[in-house]
């Protein structure tokens, strides 16, 4: 029985391992946000984005960030298990489009197409022990249904995101700190963690800080390939 379970597990994990073992790179995408997004959402996104491509040059995902994500203050480090306490839960961060079938950090299959990206926090309820050391995530919501800019309350955020995966669990991408070596260059980068088998897009999130006339840049790392430890 144990052998059978091991074989079934290996078969189930095969696609995940294959994706993680591929090579990826990030490039600037000089293309406007997709028409699948609402006009209101497109209006607050950058005119160009970032494309994640595999070693064959095939696009895996495309990302557009918000021109100025509202922030409650200047970034000043983490607060407990929250890396980005200046961000409000449910706030719009940007948008993502999967060129083909994509996968979230829980290895849930996500259909090709456009999704909004909103900031969320992992619940502290004992169900997520060992998944990650921080609580920060970007939740994917269907572009056709998430059409307003305003931040969403937690229940609507999680329910809307669950529709992206077609399950009872939100569709999530891990949001974590950008390595200093990658973020100091001021250019987008893709970081490969061989131990965790993840690929993270290091991209500059522009913050509209209360009381500040100029935007503040916060480098973040969005895990676009790879899954949570089991």
Give the positions of each predicted feature.
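Short consensus segments that form the blades of beta-propeller domains
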Residues: 86, 127-131
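Bacterial N-terminal signal peptides that target proteins for export
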Residues: 1-7
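Primarily secretory-pathway and cell-envelope proteins
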Residues: 21-84, 141-230
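N-terminal post-signal-peptidase region of extra-cytosolic proteins
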Residues: 78-85, 92-101
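Extracytoplasmic
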Residues: 58-60, 89-93, 110-112, 133-135
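A short tyrosine-centered beta-strand micro-motif
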Residues: 113-119
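Hydrophobic h-region of N-terminal signal peptides that target proteins for export
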Residues: 10-20
